[in-house]
Amino acid sequence: MEKLSERFSALQEKLMDLYESGVEDLETQIQHWKLLRQEQVLFYYARRHGILRLGYQPVPTLATSESKAKDAIAMGLLLESLQKSQYAEEPWTLVETSLETVKSPPADCFKKGPKSVEVYFDGDPENVMSYTVWSYIYYQTDDESWEKVEGHVDYTGAYYIEGTFKTYYIKFETDAKRYGTTGHWEVHVNKDTVFTPVTSSTPPVGVASQNSAPEPASTSDSPQRSSQVTHRYGRKASSPTITTIRRQKRRERQRQETPTRRRKTRSRSRSTEQRGGRATRRSLSRESAESPRRGGRGGGGPLTRSRSRSRSRTRESVDGGGVAPDEVGATLRSIGRQHSGRLAQLLDAAKDPPVILLRGAANTLKCYRYRFRKKHAGSFQFISTTWSWVGGHTTDRIGRSRILISFHTDREREKCLQQMKLPLGVEWSYGQFDDL
């Protein structure tokens, strides 16, 4: 047991020295995978003999150690084969020789120069997927020699030239069937539109040829392209609904129905207010007409004083916490019974809770939420966890992750927006709910 722990500690020291050295050559990367293989062998031996911990390190299961040891052996063989090629003298980092990089598309190839490509399905900036493509790809031929080629992107997907053939390792058509409806998409590299669908030459989804790629959009499409880029990356006010609507017909129908619903709601609220106003005037006139008859023995005096006091209290409360005229009648929610008076219920029901919707990568939003809660404590009401939209028939996530931040008032929201510093790639938009 003690000798096994000593060997494990010595192995850990060698790994730490290798990480701290930062040497970027192929020999160091081969040595790294040899040490990882020895580590898994020690874990496997310890588990077979009932040892569950080596120092402070818990021992994994036999299946886990065996699988990782096989991965280390396979990576060592690949690197030793690459060492015999003409690319052995190039700099190689731990990331470029990691198992995750080698297994990512195209699999079993070494890659360098990652770039991010965004694809807008149906031309909708909200229905976007991000892909990682590579500038240089090293693939192994049938005679176990290595070739270095450049990676390319076209309308069909990401590919590289293997001999005289196009080899696509990413096809946008696959996700277009899942997330899109029209069978068209736009390819954006470095925030610029590189490829857009051409109606006269672009085949529908499922008919596109593997080796044929449409030409880039003509110069006449540049105004539209610039407006799309501005809409995608610039801050913008939210539409009446904050949901992402993928279907074009459904989006048009909701755009037509939303103003109608608001007009109906406001007309109902105005009619109710007018009816309430007439009822109040009738009751006051009736009381004023009956007060002389009821106040014969001094009864009219106390009645008049009590009515004037109630009027003054009502006027003071309305002036102190009133609601703007354009905010009245903009809600359909029901108010709970936690309020003490009818006036407090009316003020609370007069407007909707304002929110901000943030869109971005899941990890970026999680880190920002942690910083936001510490820095802006007390300046907002609630903040949600990260969530995503899913399709109507599948559970696959659509687009990027989202977070909602609610506020007590619009002024509180505007003040917080002025102080917020959003990370790169995170966008925001306004929103309101009937209730939270």
Curated annotation (Swiss-Prot):
Where is the segment annotated DNA-binding domain?
352-436
GO BP, sorted A to Z: DNA replication; DNA-templated transcription; regulation of DNA replication; viral DNA genome replication
Query: So what does this one do?
Result: Plays a role in the initiation of viral DNA replication. A dimer of E2 interacts with a dimer of E1 in order to improve specificity of E1 DNA binding activity. Once the complex recognizes and binds DNA at specific sites, the E2 dimer is removed from DNA. E2 also regulates viral transcription through binding to the E2RE response element (5'-ACCNNNNNNGGT-3') present in multiple copies in the regulatory regions of the viral genome. Activates or represses transcription depending on E2RE's position with regards to proximal promoter elements including the TATA-box.
Q: Which GO terms describe its cellular component?
A: host cell nucleus
Which residue ranges have biased composition labelled Polar residues?
Answer: 210-230
Where in the sequence does UniProt note compositional bias of the Low complexity kind?
195-209
Instruction: Provide the protein name.
Output: Regulatory protein E2
Where in the sequence does UniProt note compositional bias of the Basic and acidic residues kind? 284-293
